[in-house]
Amino acid sequence: MNLHEYQAKSLFAEYGLPVSEGFACDTAQEAVEAAGRIGGNLWVVKCQVHAGGRGKAGGVKVTGDKEEIRAFAEYWLGKNLVTYQTDEKGQPVAKILVESCTDIANELYLGAVVDRATRRVVFMASTEGGVEIEKVAEETPELIHKAIIDPLTGPQPFQARDLGFKLGLNPTQMKQFTKIFMGLATMFVDHDFALLEINPLVITTEGNLHCLDGKIGIDGNALFRQPKIKAMHDPSQDDAREAHAAMFELNYVALDGNVGCMVNGAGLAMGTMDIVNLHGGKPANFLDVGGGATKERVAEAFKIILSDSNVKAVLVNIFGGIVRCDMIAEGIIGAVKEVGVKVPVVVRLEGTNAELGREVLAKSGLDIIAANSLTDAAELVVKAAEGK
C-alpha cells in the first residue's frame, strides 16, 4: 500500500521532521484559500497521485498568482494524470497539495528499504537528489552511500554522521540530518514501512535541511496492526481489476502483454510468465489463484483476465498438489461455460490425476487446448495469441 505525498509529510511532521506548510485540497476554492492561509507570495501546487514523474507531466506548478492556483486545480481535479510510471490511462487526481515555496540551494537524496540480502533496513543517501535513484545506482553507484540498521540496537547517531560526512554537510546541517535520520528510522519500524524516500531532501538558501517530497510504501502484510495507516488507503489509486481480484483472494497484477496467465502459486506464476516471454509472447498479467482453485475462483479469474481487451489467448497452468487435477479440470470447464470465453485457452495440468484431468478437458467439447508440458503450453499459447 502506498501513501500520497501529503500523507507522508503528515507523518514526517509527527516525528519532528522539517516539512513545508501545506494543505491537501478537494476543490479549486479550497486550494485558493489554502494559499491565503499559508501566506507569502509564492506557492507550489501538486497533483496527488501514486506515481512519480508528476512535474514532467504537468502535475506540479510553482506560481505567485492565486488565480493560477484556481485554474490548475479546476483543470486537474477529476482528471487522470499520465506519467512515465503510470499506464496509458494514468491515475485519477482527487486532491491538490498547496504548499509554501522553498528556496533551494542544493538537492540530496535520502531513502530506506527492507534489503532482503542483508535482512535489514538499509538507508541510502546521495548527493544526486532530484533524479531517479535507479539511474544513479546504474550509472554512478559510488555516489550512493548506505547505512545498515541493526534490529537489535536500532538506528545510531554515528550512522547518520557517517552519511552526513559523505554528503559534505556542515556541523549545523549534520545535527539536522541526524535528527531526520533517527526520526525516519524510528518511523520506518513503527509503521511497518517497506519503502521510504525523500527525493529531494534539500538544503535551502539559508543552509537548512528540508524534506521537499515524500514517498512511503507500507508492507501490506502488516496493515492488520496499523489501523491508522490502513485508514489512509486511497482505493481510487488502485487498478480496478487488481482491487476486484483481491475481493476473491486472487493475486492479480496487470501487465501490458496479450497472453493472459492463470496459475496456482506465485513461484509457478512467475516461472510461467518467464517461459511465455522466452517463447516470444508477452504476459498480460500475473494471476495467482492460490491453492484452492475452485470453479468460482477460476470463473472470477477468467472474468478479470478477459476484462483486458488486449488478451488474445489464455494460458492456465495448474499444479495439482492439494487439489486433484480432474477436479481442477471440471472447474475450468464450468468457468469457461459460465464466462463464455471467446479466445483460445491452453491448459497445462501436472500433479495428482493430471492424465485424468486432461481426459476430462478433451471430452468437454470446448475449445480448450490441453498441453503436455510447460514448454508445449507456452509454444501453443504464443501461437494462439498471434492467430496461428
UniProtKB/Swiss-Prot annotation:
Please tell me one Gene Ontology term that the record gives under cellular component.
cytosol
The record's Gene Ontology biological-process terms are: succinyl-CoA metabolic process; tricarboxylic acid cycle
The record's InterPro entries line, in alphabetical order, gives:
ATP-grasp, ATP-grasp_succ-CoA_synth-type, ATP_grasp_subdomain_1, Succ-CoA_synthase_bsu_CS, SUCC_ACL_C, Succ_CoA_ligase-like_bsu, Succinyl-CoA_synth-like
Q: Which part of the chain is the ATP-grasp domain? A: 9-244
- What remark does the entry make about the cofactor? Binds 1 Mg(2+) ion per subunit.
Residues binding Mg(2+) are: N199, D213
- Decide whether keyword Transmembrane helix is in the record: no
GO MF assignments? ATP binding; magnesium ion binding; succinate-CoA ligase (ADP-forming) activity; succinate-CoA ligase (GDP-forming) activity
Q: Where does substrate bind?
A: N264, G321, I322, V323
Where does this protein act, in terms of pathway? Answer: Carbohydrate metabolism; tricarboxylic acid cycle; succinate from succinyl-CoA (ligase route): step 1/1
- Which co-factors does it depend on? Mg(2+)
Q: What does this protein do?
A: Succinyl-CoA synthetase functions in the citric acid cycle (TCA), coupling the hydrolysis of succinyl-CoA to the synthesis of either ATP or GTP and thus represents the only step of substrate-level phosphorylation in the TCA. The beta subunit provides nucleotide specificity of the enzyme and binds the substrate succinate, while the binding sites for coenzyme A and phosphate are found in the alpha subunit.
| Family per similarity comment | Belongs to the succinate/malate CoA ligase beta subunit family.
This protein's assembly is summarised as: Heterotetramer of two alpha and two beta subunits.
Protein name per the record: Succinate--CoA ligase [ADP-forming] subunit beta
Q: Which organism is it from?
A: Shewanella oneidensis (strain ATCC 700550 / JCM 31522 / CIP 106686 / LMG 19005 / NCIMB 14063 / MR-1)
